[in-house]
Amino acid sequence: MAEVSVQRILLLVVSLAKCLEGTKLLAHLKKCGDLECETLISRVLALRDYTGPDCRYLNFTTGEEISVYVKLGGDREDLWAGSKGKDFGFFPRDAVEIEEVFISEEVEMPTKSDFLCLLGEGYIFGSEQSELNSEDDEEHMYPYEKDEDQNYNIYEGDFQPEPDLYAAAEGTLLEDQIPASEAPDDFRFSSEWKAWEGAGSQGGGEQDYTADSDQDLPSLSKPERQGWFGLGTEEAEEKVFESDTEPTQELALEEESDLEKLHSGEPQVELEQEPKSETLEFSSVPDEEYELESETESILKPQASGWFGEGLTSYLGFGNEEAGLELLSKESNPPLQDIPSSVPPDEEVPAPCREISTDKEDAVINDSSVLSPSWFYYGFGMLGFTNADEDNIVSDKGENEDGEVDNLKHPIGSDFDPEKEQERKIVTVETEDQAGTESVLEKTDESGSMQYLKKFFDNPWGFQSLPEDTELPFSKKMLDQDDIVENDKIEELSTENSPTGSMKDPVMLASRYVLSDIDSEVELPMEEHEGVHFKPSSSKRNEDDSNSWADPEELSVAQTDGSAEGALLDTQLVSPKEHAADFQLLKYLLQIDVYGFMSSALSPIEILLESVVAALPEDMRADFNPSGFSLELAVCVLSVGLLAVVLFLWRGFRSIRSRFYVGREKKLALELSALIEEKCKLLDKVSIVQKEYEGLESSLKEASFEKESTEAQSLEFVEGSQISEATYENLEQSKSKLEDEILLLEEKLEEERAKHSEQDELMADISKRIQSLEDESKSLKSQVAEAKTTFRIFEINEERLKGAIKDALNENSQLQESQKQLLQETEMMKEQVNDLDKQKVALEESRAQAEQALSEKESQIETLVTSLLKMKDWAAVLGEADDGNLDLDMKSGLENTAALDNQPKGALKKLIYAAKLNASLKALEGERNQVYTQLSEVDQVKEDLTEHIKSLESKQASLQSEKTEFESESQKLQQKLKVITELYQENEMKLHRKLTVEENYRLEKEEKLSKVDEKISHATEELETCRQRAKDLEEELERTIHSYQGQVISHEKKAHDNWLAARTLERNLNDLRKENAHNRQKLTETEFKFELLEKDPYALDVPNTAFGREHSPYGPSPLGRPPSETRAFLSPPTLLEGPLRLSPLLPGGGGRGSRGPENLLDHQMNTERGESSYDRLSDAPRAPSDRSLSPPWEQDRRMTAHPPPGQPYSDPALQRQDRFYPNSGRLSGPAELRSYNMPSLDKVDGPVPSEMESSGNGTKDNLGNSNVPDSPIPAECEAAGRGFFPPPFPPVRDPLFPVDPRSQFMRRGPSFPPPPPGSIYAAPRDYFPPRDFPGPPLPPFPGRTVYAPRGFPPYLPPRAGFFPPPPHPESRSELPPDLIPPSKEPAADPPETQEA
C-alpha cells in the first residue's frame, strides 16, 4: 500500500510539474551569434520552395536569400530561424544552401520561449493556444495537427507516462495537463481509452459498459475549457454587451458544433470498431422523447450563463429572466445518434448501473445545451454567481437525497471499484426508501418563504454542518480514480455519522434540497466533464412530480420512463410560471447570500483537503479525521485556495475588462462607420448642391444677358432721336463692370503667371541643387572608389612585402644552414689536416730514419768497397766475379761483415753473401723509391689541403659578408615594414575619418535631399493647384469672354436690325424730304416764273442762271444753303464703348468719328478685344455729314476734288487702290465691320481717314436707293471721306456720275483742274457753288497725300492662356495688316515687323 501511495504522490507531483511547465517550445537549446541572438550568423540561399505549417515558419521560394540568426539545437537541429525582408520564422536546414558565413563561433544557450506568432491563425503561446484560437474561428486550429513528423508531436514526446501508471491512475490526467482544445484528438482519446481499458480490467462488466458509454465525455472538454480565464468564443465576446442571453446562445451553438465535430472525428470511429449494440435504455427511447428533449433543451439553454453564469446578471439586477424562451429550435443539442453509445452485446448490465449509464447519457445530452464555457470549472460558484432558476436544469428529486448526493457527485472512477460499487448500491437502496418522505417535504417546502428562511438560517460556518449536497467534485487534474473512490467512502461515512445529516429534520432537508439545486446547477458543467452523473430516483417519485405538471402529453412521456432520463426530462419540462415565485425569492436571497459566498470560497478548500487526504498513504489516512485535521495542512490548503481564488478573481476581472474593451471597440467601429456614411452622404449632398448652385449661377447669368438683350431690343428709334441717356449709361456701366472684371481676371492671371514663373525658377533652382547634389554624390562615390582602390593597392603592396620578407627570411635561414654546414665541413677538414700533419710528421721521422740507415749503408758500402779493393786478389783467383757481381757481393757483405770476418776464408760463401747483399740493396732501393713517392704524394695532398682551406676561408669570409649584408637588408626591410604599417594605419585612419565625415556629409545631404524632396513635393502640389486654378480661371475667363461675345453679337445683331430699320425709315424720310424740296423748288420756280411772267411775259426764253442751282437737281435753295434736314444721320449702335458713330460703313473712321494717328499697341489690343476704331470720338475736326445720308448736292460737292499743285491727275499714285473684301454671308453692319477693320494711313497735313465698305452693303443700298435716280450704278473707285475738295468755279455741266458709297465699287470722274489756293481740306460750310455748269463732271478725288498706304507691322498674338491688358480708352481697333491686300503702289516706308 505504501508503494501505491508513493506512486500516487509522484504522479501528482509530475502532473503538477508538467502543468506548470507547458509545451510551447520547439527545442530547449538554440545556437546564436551572440547572447541576444541579434547577430547575423550566415546568409543562405533557398534550394526549393517551402511553405510552413503555421505562421511561425518562414515561407520562401527557390532562389531567395535568407539571413540566419538562430539555429535550434537538441532534437530540432534541422530547424533554423531567420528573416527574409520583414518576415521572420523557422525553416528546415535541408531546404537552403549556405552562401556566406559571417560568424564561425556560435553561442549555445537554452531556449526561454519561442517568438509570439501574431500573423497566422492566432497566438502560438503555451497552453492557451485553443482559447486564443477559438476567438478567430469555431474550428480550432492545431499547429501540430498537420505535421506527421514525430518531432513535431510535442504531446506524445514531451510527457508519456509508463503503462503501469494507467492501472492505478486516471487516464485523463494527461488530458488535463494538456488542454483539450490544444492537444490532438487522437492523442487525447487514445490516452483516455487506455486508462479506461486498464481500469475496466479491474472492474467488471458493468464498469466496461460505463466506460463505453462515457467515451464521448472528453469531447466536451474543449468547449468547457474554451471558457477558462474568460477566453470564450468570438461570438460570445461580440454579443456580451448587447444582451444577457446572446452570449449563452452563441456559446451553446458553438458547443453543438464542437460536439458534432468531435463525435464525427477519429475517436468515434475508433470506438465504433468493436462490435457493439445499443442498450435497451437508449433503444427504448422513442422519437417523441427526442423531440421533447430538443424542445426542453432550447428552453434550458439560455439559462446557462457566459463565463460566470446567470447569477451575476440576477444579482446585479440586469438579467433577463425569460430570455431562454427566445431561442429557436435550431440552437438545441445535436441528436442522440451523434453520441456513441454501443456496448458489447454479451455483457449484462445490472439495473442500477443501467440507470446510471442512462442518466449519464442524459447528462451528456442535456449538458451540451445547458453547459456553457465558464472561466473556471472547479465546481464552485465564484461569489455566488450561480443560476437562480435551478429547477430548469436539475431534477427535483435527485438532489435532496443524502445517499444519492454522493453518487451524483462522484466521478467516473467510482464505478470502477467493485467494493465501492457495492457500498454505493446499498446507499442507493436506502435513499430510494426515503423518496416518499422527501417528496412530501419537497411539496411542503415549495413556498418561497420557507426556502428563504431555510437557507438564510442554515449554519454555513463549518464543514461538519454542511449537507452532503454541498460537497463538490474535484478536478481530474489532481486525483485519480481510486483516490476519488476512497474519498467518496469517507464522505459517505462521515455524512451518515454527522448529527446534521439525519433525514428527520424537514427544515434541514428542505435547505439541503434548495442548496443541492443551486450547487448542482453550478457544478453541472464540471460534473459532466468528470463523468459525474445523476442518480435516478424511484418511479413513485416521478409519478408524484408528474402529477403537478400541466401538459398531459408530457406527463405520459415522463411516466413511461422510470429512469433518470425521464426524471430529468420531467424536470426540464416544468413551466417557468410555476417557479416564478421560487426564482424571485432566490434572486433576493442571492443579494444577501453570505452563505453562497462562503460555501463557494470554502468548497475548493474542502475538496483540496479531501484530495490531499486521499493522496496520503493508507496508514496516514486512517488516523486522519476531516473534522480534526492538523493545523499545518489546513494553513497550507487555505493559503493555496486563497491564492487560487485571488488568481482567478484577477483573471476574471481581466476577462471582463477585455470584453468591455471589445464591446467598446465594436461600438466605436459602428459609430465610425455611421459617421463615415454620414460624411459620404453629406459630400454627395454638397456636390449636388454645388451643381445646383452652378446651374443657378449660369441660369442667372443667362437671365441677366437676356435681360440686357431685351433692354437692347426695347430701344426704339424715332425720327431724328438718339438712344436714351439712361440706357446708354446702363450700357456704359455694364461695360465698365465687365472691363473691371476682365482687369481683375487679367491681374489674377498675371499673378498666377508670376507665381508660375517663380515656381519654375524654384523648380530650376531645385533641379540645379539636385544636380549639384548628384554630382557631389557621384564625386563622393568616385572618391570612395578611389579610396577603395588605394586601399586595395596598399593591401596588394603589403602582401608583396610580406612575400618578399618571407622569401628573405627563408633565404637567410638557408644561408645560415649552409654556413653551419660549411663550418662543420671546415672542422672536419681541420681534423683531416691534423691527421695528415701527424702522418707527415711520422713519415718525416721514418724518412730521417731511412736516411740515417741509408747513410750507414753508404758508409758500410764504402768500407766494403775499400775492403773489396783490398781483396782484388781474391777476384783474380776465383775469376768468377765481375764488376757487377762484385758490387753485389760488397753490398751483401756489408750485412754479413761479421760473417765475413768470421769466415774470411771461404770464397764461395763470400760470393753468395755478395749476391745476397746485392739483392738486399735492390730491395732497399725500391723501398726508398716508394718512400719518395709517398712523400711526394703527401706533399701534394698537403698543398691541396692548404689550397682547399684557403678557398674555404675565402668562402667563409664571403658568406660572412653576405650574412651581414642580408642582416642589414632584413633590418632595413623590417624598418620599411614598420614604416609602411604605420603609414598604412595612418592612411587607414585618415580614410576612416574621411569616410565617416563623408558618411555624415552624405547623411546630411540625404536629409537635405529629403527636405528638398518634401519641398519639391509641396512645390509640385502648389504648382498643380496653381495650374488647376489658372486653368479654372482661364476656363472661367473663356466662358465669360464667350458669353460676352455672344451677348455683344446678339446685341450687334439686334442693333444692326434696328439700324436697318432706321435706315429704311431715313431713306423714306429722305425721299419725302426730296419730294418736299422738289415740290418747294417747283413752287419757288413757279413763283419765280410767275413773277417773271408778271414782270416780263417773255422771260421764259432766258437761260436760268440762278445762284445755287448747280448743286441740286431740283434747283438751288432759296436761302442759298442746304436744307436743315441734311444733317448726318447716326449710325446704328453696337453697344460697345465710345460715343455714337456716324455710319457702319466707314471702317476708317470717316466723318465725325475720324481722328488722328493712334498707337499701334492700342490698335492691336482693341483689335483683340473686338473694339472698333469708329467707336470713339477724336480730337480732329469732324466732317459735316456722312456721305451715304447727305443730300445729293453734298454728295456732288464732295465728289469734286482738285489735285495738289504740280501733280497731274493721271499719276497712278493719286489713284486709290480698290479694295475688295469677302462677303461674310450675312447682312453687313457693325458685326461685319468688327471682323474687317482697316488700319489708319499715314497722314501728312492732317487726318485723312479712309472710308471702306463691305461687299454685302451694295445690294442693300442699291435696294434702298431704288427711289433715287441714277443710284444703282456701281462705282469704279472708292469714295473719299471728308477731305474732298470742292470745285472752285462752276464748270460746264455734264451728266452726273451718281455714286453710292454703300456699294462695292466707286467710280472716279475724269481729271479736273486743281482748285485755287484756299482751304486745302474742303470748302467752307457756307460755300455752295452752283450746281449746273457746263463741261465734264468733276472727278471725285479724296484729300489725301501722294504717298502710298503703309502697312503696319503685325502685333504678336498672345500665347494660350494669356489675355492682353486693357486698352487705352482713346485707342481704337483697326483691321490687322495681314488682311490688307498688297498694294501695287510703291511704299514710301518699308513695313516694320515686330517679332517676339
Swiss-Prot record:
- Leader peptide range in chain numbering: 1-22
Q: Where are the transmembrane segments?
A: 629-649
Keyword Isomerase applies: no
Record field: compositional bias (Low complexity): 1135-1146
Pro residues bias located where? 1331-1342, 1351-1368
PANTHER family in the record = MELANOMA INHIBITORY ACTIVITY PROTEIN 2, MELANOMA INHIBITORY ACTIVITY-RELATED
Its name, as the record gives it, is Melanoma inhibitory activity protein 2
Q: Which gene encodes it?
A: Mia2
